[in-house]
Regions:
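Basic/hydrophobic alpha-helical interface regions
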Residues: 18-19
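TRNA-binding/sensing appendages of the translation machinery
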Residues: 26-30, 48
Length: 491
């Protein structure tokens, strides 16, 4: 992200890609939900109180007070610029829970998560849902969450992916809800955004952009040659370019839904012991693999070959993102791995071992200097090319028998911490919701849970998976199948 004036910064190509890909069938929303125990509060949070609470915290992220500004004809990458008309009433909302129980809460949060973000304003929203209870069903059935409070408030933070990735979300949540009562000041509004200045600068930089693009293509081409050589000699292993398609790889309908399961830590550790050397992430991938395999089998839709997952790997540390401050050069720091889920292997422990081996190979490939250099070709791509690539996604055919590289997404975000508070209300649980899109109608997010367990949320198309309860049960059963061999031998 290049600085072009006080308070005005230009998006990095990796972040601008989310702007250019935005459509009704390809949203780039990031959503995280925090549940707080408000059973000791005398009265629920009101909207004026919520607005005052948020006003004190606006200095924690540039996106809270800045909006996207696109250059006419996309002659250059978009900019973040201060929004002089920013009104907190457009961003902070308070509403009561529509009904007791987990299912009504899911529906209420799903509507919030799937609604488009207004990119003519700072691209974020914060919704508070008061009077939440999970008493009737759902989470109460999980032993680890059997002690949920009788009254909670859900804080639903939503923002555009161009402003940050999953790790940035975790860090921002810690700043907003952390115990520190001191908050940075809101930046003073600098000079106004000038479209004419941006166009003039873009036209003047066109020769430099063309030269940078040529050099980027040459560097990426050289890196691709080295990759082919290292694949040939076995130094790295390329993942399969195509996978058999399944119901979750079709165009999505209009209804997003999600669900959540809490998986017990003792079973995760037992599964690790059953396959010596397996990591927690390996166990989670194998758990999802087993559930997906069984779910498709029950629909009489077992694929001809193994399915694979897109697994983002964080590259944090290469630069600061928007959530860290307005001067950061990049908001998104991710490499996208394609991990074989080995859904064609019947034995659960054998499948876990195979997934562990595939994950290690993909991590090795993704960290390879030539692979990373090849991926950096986007850094020199002109804005117009990124825009055309983004628009092309809307016309992609998803009716074929195969898909490119992966069938589902499995992401992992570390636990935000035990000391988060909403006013004086302590945190009970946090989970995220990943946006679905055409060709990717089932996505999973793993969050280390408070206490001894791991929370797995999954978002899907209600038409593709009308029975999320069944998939939740299959996730539990899949982990139990992985843990049983260790219990049988007394590990």
């Amino acid at each position: 992200m290049r600085v072009s004036g006080a308070g005005v910064t230009q998006l990095a190509p990796q972040d601008a890609e989310f702007v250019y890909s935005e459509s009704s069938r390809h949203r780039s929303n990031i959503v995280v939900v925090y549940l707080f125990d408000t059973s000791a509060e005398a009265a629920p949070l009101t909207e004026p109180e919520a607005i005052a609470w948020m006003r004190a915290r606006l200095g924690h992220a540039g996106m809270f007070t800045r909006r996207l500004r696109r250059v006419p004809l996309d002659l250059d990458l978009p900019y973040w610029a201060p929004d002089p008309r920013m009104n907190l009433r457009d961003h902070v909302h308070v509403s009561p829970a529509e009904a007791p129980g987990w299912d009504p809460l899911r529906r209420q949060i799903s509507r919030i998560a799937d609604a488009p973000i207004d990119l003519t304003r700072p691209p974020w929203e914060l919704h508070f849902i008061t009077g939440v209870t999970t008493r009737e069903r759902g989470l109460r059935r999980d032993p680890i969450s059997a002690g949920d409070p009788d009254r909670m408030t859900a804080a639903v933070l939503k923002f555009h992916h161009s402003a940050g990735d999953g790790i940035a979300t975790r860090d921002l949540g810690r700043r907003l809800f952390g115990p520190d009562t001191s908050h940075p000041p809101v930046p003073t509004r600098p000079r106004d955004w000038s479209t004419a200045t941006a166009v003039t600068r873009a036209l003047a930089s066109l020769p430099v952009q063309c030269l940078r693009f040529r050099r980027g293509l040459a560097a990426a081409g050289a890196a691709d040659e080295r990759i082919r050589a290292e694949v040939a000699d076995g130094t790295i292993v390329e993942p399969a370019l195509s996978r058999p398609s399944c119901r979750f790889n079709r165009p999505i309908s209009a209804e997003l839904t999600f669900d959540l399961v809490i998986l017990p830590g003792d079973q995760i550790r037992a599964a690790q012991a059953a396959a010596d050397g397996a990591t927690v992430n390996d166990v989670m991938l194998a758990t999802i693999s087993g559930a997906l395999r069984t779910y498709l089998s029950e629909q009489d839709e077992s694929p001809d070959g193994s399915l694979a997952a897109m697994v983002p790997m964080s590259l944090r540390g290469t630069g600061k993102g928007v959530a860290d401050g307005p001067e950061g050069p990049r908001a998104t720091h991710l490499a996208l791995m394609a991990v074989d889920l080995h859904t064609d292997i019947g034995d659960p422990v054998d499948r876990l071992r195979a997934i562990g081996a595939s994950t290690r190979l993909e991590k090795q490939r993704s960290r390879n200097e030539h692979v990373r250099r090849s991926a950096r070709r986007i850094e020199s791509s002109p804005a117009l090319l990124l825009r055309l690539a983004g628009r092309a996604k809307a016309f992609k055919d998803h009716s074929g028998p195969t898909v490119e590289r992966y069938n589902t997404m499995i992401s992992n975000v570390p636990w935000a911490g035990d000391d988060l508070l909403l006013r004086s209300a302590p945190l009970v649980r946090t989970f995220g919701i990943l946006e679905i899109l055409d060709g990717s109608g089932l996505r999973h997010l793993i969050v280390s849970s408070r206490g001894d367990g791991v929370a797995v949320s999954f978002s899907t198309d209600a038409a593709m998976m009308p029975d999320t309860d069944r998939y939740r049960d299959l996730l539990r059963d899949s982990l139990r199948d992985l843990a049983e061999p260790a219990h049988e031998v007394g590990i």
